[in-house]
Amino acid sequence: MGIKYFFKWLKTNHSESIKCIDRHDNSQCIDVLLIDMNGIIHNSAQEVYGYGSFSFPKENACDKKVYSLVCRQIDRMVIQFKPKELILCIDGVAPRSKQIQQRQRRFLAAHDRKKPGTEFNFDCNKGNTSKFDSNSISPGTEFMHNLGRYIDIHIKKKQKPAFTGRETTDAPQNNWRNKDQSWRQKVDDTAEWSNLTVVFANDKVSGEGEHKLLDYIRKYGNSYYTYCIYGSDADLIMLSMSALTTTAIKNIYVLRDEYKSPNYLLINIPNFVKNLIKDVKSNWTDKLDEKRFINDFIFMCFMVGNDFLPHIPSIEIMTNGIESMLAFYTKNKNYITDNNGLGEIFNYESLLPILKDLEGLEQSLCNEKVNNSEYFRDDLLESSSFLVTNEFGQQKCVNINEYREKYMKKHFESSSEASLMYLEGMQWVLSYYTLKVPDWEWSYKYDYAPNLTSIIEAMSFKQIGGTSKKEKNQYKLFPVNSVNSTEVATSSSGFQKSFSMVFQNSLQNTKDWRDKKTKTSSDAIPPFHQLLFILPPDSSDLLPYPLCEALTNELKIYAPKELIIDRAGKRQEWEGIVLLPKLDQKVVTECYLKYKPYVTEKKDLIRDIKGRTFKYQNGEVSFL
C-alpha cells in the first residue's frame, strides 16, 4: 500500500509528470523493465476467482489459470516495451516491522472472506464452489511455490522458440476490461524473448519485491539505460526517487495501471523531481543541495504514511500534510537528512522546528474533523470538544491540550517509550529506503503513533510525565550528526543500540551518544516461520502438517474471536486500524522449532528454503 493518497496528490499537483499510454503504444524506449510481481498476482487471482475488482469467476477457475494469466501479462509488457533486460521480483520474507502489517491484512482478509460473494473458487474437476484464500499469496505457500516454478518454466520456453505457444485468454464478464480486449490477443513474441536477459527472484528470495528491484538497480545500474518499474504501490515512486540520489542512473519511470481503464500511467520521475526542486528553489535563498532535498522529501512523505509505522495523527496528505511540511521546510531552510559516507541519517535538530510548526496546525485540523461528517466519529475528539457560536452558527471546538492528554493515556502506557521508539522507526525507514534493511528483527510495537507534542518533548530531551529513572536509562534517541550505518545494517539484538543515545539523568549534553558495537547480524526468518506469524487460524491449511497445528493450538490465543477495526477519525473504511492481540515472537519461534523437524515431505521442505535469484540469458540459466 505504501503512502496512502500519495498518487492522488501527485496527479493533482504534478500532472505534467504523468503520461497516459495505451497498451498498443510501443513508442516508449525502455532498456530495463522491472516488475513488482505481487500486484499482477493479486489482480490475476481476482480475475480468475471473481473477487475484488471482478464480479464473477472464470469457468473452471483454478490456480493454473492464475499462473497462466500472470505470465500472459508479462508477455504483453515484453512485447509492448521491448526491453533489453526484464527483472521480475515476487515478495519474499519481509522484515518484522512489515510482518506486523501483513498480519493485520491477512486477518482482515480472513474476516472479509466470511462475507457473501468474496474469493470464490470453482473446483476444476467437480465444479463445486468453495472459497479461494487470498492469504495463499504469501511466501512459503504451495500456491506461491507452484507459481514460481510455472514462471521459471515459462521463461525457459520463451527463450527456446520451439517450445513457445499459449492459449488466448477469456474475456471477463461485466467488467471495465470489456471496453478494449484487443491488447490481449495472441501475438508472435519470439524476437522479443530471444535476446532478452531475464532476472527472476521468486518468493524464496527474502525481501519485498520492490526492494529487490531497487537492489538490482543499485548493484547493476547503467547510467546510459532507461529504467521502468511496474507496480501500483506509492513506495515505488519513493524508491525511484531514492535511486536518483544513490545510483548513477538518470532516467527512471514508474508504470502503473490507470484506474478503471485499460491504459497505463507513466510517471516521469526525473521530471517530477525537477519540478519539485523548482518549487522549493523559489523560496530557498542559498544554493539548494538537490540530492539532500530529494532525501528530505522522501523522509517527510514517510511521516504521512508508510507500511512500517502508523502515521502521526495530525499529518495527513488529505489535509495538506505534504504542502504544510514543504512550506515549513523552506521556511526553516535546514536539511533534515545527511549522508555520513555510510548511509543516510536524519538530524533531529533540523526536524524539530518543522514538527513544532506542524503542531501549531493541530487545533484547526481537529476542529475540522470533529465538525465534518465525512470522517468516522472519534470519541476522543468528541469528549474533548465544546460548543461555540460564531458567524456560521454553533460549532464544536476541541480543547487541544485535553485531547492530546487523553490520546496518549488511551494508547500508551509510557509516552516516552512510544515517542523514542517512533523516532527509532523513522531512522529505520530512512535507512531501509536509501540503503537496505537496517535490522530484520526491529519493529514498532504499538498500533498508534504518538502525537506531535510527545515526539517534540522527546526530541527536546524534556522529561515526560511518568517516566521513571529506569526508563530514562533504557530508552534511546538518535545521534545528531553522524552514525555508523554499517553497524545498523548488521544489527541483531537491537537496532536501538546502533542509533542510540541513552537518556542521561541530567539531560544536559544532547550530542553525547554512545556508538555501541553490534555482535551479530540479523537475517530474514524462514518462510514457514513468517507464515506462523502472519496467518490467522482460518488459513492454517496453507502450512504443512504438523506446523499448521500451531495456528489452531498454541497460537490461537493470539487470534481474536471478533475482529476490532478502529476507524475513528478516518475517511474510508479501508483506512481503519486492525487491532490484534500482540503476538509473542518467542512463542512463534518455539512453535516453529518444535514442529518443523516433523515436516518430512520433500515437496513441503522445499517451500521453506532460502532461495537465490535466477538469471536467464541465451537459453542458459545461472545464479545472480
From Swiss-Prot:
Keywords: Exonuclease, Hydrolase, Nuclease. Disulfide bonds: none annotated. Residues 161-180 are annotated as: Disordered. Belongs to the 5'-3' exonuclease family. This is Putative exonuclease 012L. PANTHER family: 5'-3' EXORIBONUCLEASE 1, 5'->3' EXORIBONUCLEASE. CDD domains: PIN_XRN1-2-like. The lineage of its organism: Viruses, Varidnaviria, Bamfordvirae, Nucleocytoviricota, Megaviricetes. Its EC number is 3.1.11.-. GO terms for biological process: nuclear-transcribed mRNA catabolic process. InterPro entries: 5_3_exoribonuclease, Xrn1_helical, Xrn1_N. It comes from Invertebrate iridescent virus 6 (IIV-6). GO terms for molecular function: 5'-3' RNA exonuclease activity; RNA binding. Pfam families: XRN_M (PF17846), XRN_N (PF03159).
